[in-house]
């Protein structure tokens, strides 16, 4: 019983946060839709508003759809890297193998450390 109450409270809080995120920008709306379709059991657990007119691209025609109608099933989910404003992670780091000491610490007595380890 307490778990059901907790879950309802969590869904309300998540709904508030996703609504706020979706109202901030077009990419925020895309992220909200991705989170709700990926991690929630039912499509209608969290209601995400459509983007405002200023967030829509100029060529996009306004959609006339009642709020209660469920969207059509999506054949596959959109990857996060294709959401506007989310950039692909690059794995270039400032570290290279030559700059990392053999045992993870810099020491003048590396052979003595090797014997101890």
From Swiss-Prot:
Its main location: cytoplasm. GO terms for cellular component: cytosol; membrane. InterPro entries: PDE4_UCR (IPR040844). Residues 42-79 are annotated as: Disordered. PROSITE patterns: ER_TARGET. Binds 2 divalent metal cations per subunit. Site 1 may preferentially bind zinc ions. Binds 2 divalent metal cations per subunit. Site 2 has a preference for magnesium and/or manganese ions. Pathway: Purine metabolism; 3',5'-cyclic AMP degradation; AMP from 3',5'-cyclic AMP: step 1/1. This is 3',5'-cyclic-AMP phosphodiesterase 4A. The gene is PDE4A.
